[in-house]
Amino acid sequence: MIHSKKLTLGICLVLLIILIVGYVIMTKTNGRNAQIKDTFNQTLKLYPTKNLDDFYDKEGFRDQEFKKGDKGTWIVNSEMVIEPKGKDMETRGMVLYINRNTRTTKGYYFISEMTDDSNGRPKDDEKRYPVKMEHNKIIPTKPLPNDKLRKEIENFKFFVQYGDFKDINDYKDGDISYNPNVPSYSAKYQLKNDDYNVKQLRKRYNIPTNKAPKLLIKGDGDLKGSSVGSKNLEFTFVENKEENIYFTDSVQYTSSEDTSYESN
């Protein structure tokens, strides 16, 4: 009888320890997930910024990477990648460097085509067309081969200008992950075609699939805040060995000393 009571007590003690450990782990995970969501929400508040000139007066997270007096530079990037079955992968997008010190913006529009060389190895053929921005207008700074490309560049809109995440907290069944070794973190959501941002992308791009995309929000760097690291959005419509269709976007605030670009 005494042995039975000791055994029962021992089992209860083990179960209690398991419950306590489980509760601690769950609490820690929930706290970290909330911190990840809060970190992303700070970035998503920038959407939409319809007038890119507004970035001259916006300040992001500053740390010791910034020199005294440096107001920083915003880097905005949007690109659409389409690889239909049996065809080459083509990427079209634009990058702008919005310098808050000089209140000037330069960058480039790019068209990249992934093909195979004579040995069957992947080859990335990218062409860049330098641009500047004045009064929220994109202006090519070098002659272009045709008017179609000129209109494409002048009419280009970054996702940050029309994307809107006011309903982000209503997204259901998000898959949140965290890797402390990098550190990196992400949140993934399955969207529907009636989602506002999905409709905006379909309005602006000829997306050759009716599949609704998954939204992946990913970042790296210190969760508490750091100018070293990045946060990116990715809308993946199709992803497999034969076909890839996805859109990526990023808005990054960094020290002006760390920014450089090349155009050809």
Curated annotation (Swiss-Prot):
- Pfam families annotated for this entry? DUF576
How does the entry describe its membrane topology? Single-pass membrane protein
Is rRNA-binding among this UniProt entry's keywords? no
Transmembrane as a keyword? yes
Q: Which InterPro entries match?
A: Csa, Csa_sf
Q: Give the subcellular location.
A: Cell membrane
Q: Can you list the GO cellular component terms from the UniProt entry?
A: plasma membrane
Instruction: Name the residues that span the membrane.
Output: 7-27
NCBIfam families for the chain? SA_tandem_lipo
Record-stated family: Belongs to the staphylococcal tandem lipoprotein family.
- According to UniProt, the name of this protein is Uncharacterized protein SA2269
Query: Source species, please?
Result: Staphylococcus aureus (strain N315)
